[in-house]
């Protein structure tokens, strides 16, 4: 006997003209999140979710692809103007911002909110290759 097909509730499109982009660029991955001004997530994408695995996740191209995916989904929800917050030391910072600009968003501001320790935890030892 076949199981009845489950019909889920389809997510409704919100109309949010102004939003905020959070770019979290670590050494291993880049995560891009589009939110409304209150911080509720509209769309998100990451290098790993975009199909890149292993060391290719940390490349600028992977960050660009992820940013384009998240940006298109945010545009479907009516977003036109964004402010950008960038966090982390990763290589995908610049390319993600360029991709968001290329999709057609009007960028209101760009802020770097990378946390800088005031001599907090001891960092990992230097790599010897």
UniProtKB/Swiss-Prot annotation:
GO cellular component: ribonucleoprotein complex; ribosome
Source species, domain of life: Bacteria
Molecular functions per Gene Ontology: rRNA binding; structural constituent of ribosome
InterPro entries for this protein: Ribosomal_uS11, Ribosomal_uS11_bac-type, Ribosomal_uS11_CS, Ribosomal_uS11_sf
Keyword Ribosomal protein attached: yes
Keyword RNA-binding: yes
Keyword entries, A-Z: Ribonucleoprotein, Ribosomal protein, RNA-binding, rRNA-binding
Pfam family, one: Ribosomal_S11
One BP annotation, GO: translation
Assembly mode: Part of the 30S ribosomal subunit. Interacts with proteins S7 and S18. Binds to IF-3.
Function summary: Located on the platform of the 30S subunit, it bridges several disparate RNA helices of the 16S rRNA. Forms part of the Shine-Dalgarno cleft in the 70S ribosome.
Family the UniProt entry places it in: Belongs to the universal ribosomal protein uS11 family.
HAMAP family: Ribosomal_uS11
Name this protein carries in UniProt: Small ribosomal subunit protein uS11
Native species: Lawsonia intracellularis (strain PHE/MN1-00)
């Amino acid at each position: 006997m076949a199981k009845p097909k489950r019909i889920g509730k389809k997510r409704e499109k919100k109309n949010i003209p102004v939003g905020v982009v959070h770019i979290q660029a670590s050494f291993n991955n880049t995560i891009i999140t589009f939110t409304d001004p209150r911080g509720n997530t509209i769309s998100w994408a990451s290098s790993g979710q975009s199909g890149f695995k292993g060391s290719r996740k940390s490349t600028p191209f992977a960050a660009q692809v992820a940013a384009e995916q998240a940006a298109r989904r945010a545009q479907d929800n009516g977003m036109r103007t964004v402010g950008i917050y960038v966090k982390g030391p990763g290589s995908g910072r610049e390319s993600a911002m360029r991709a968001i600009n290329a999709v057609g968003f009007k960028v209101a501001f760009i802020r770097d909110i990378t946390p800088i320790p005031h001599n907090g935890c001891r960092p990992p030892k230097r790599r010897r290759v």
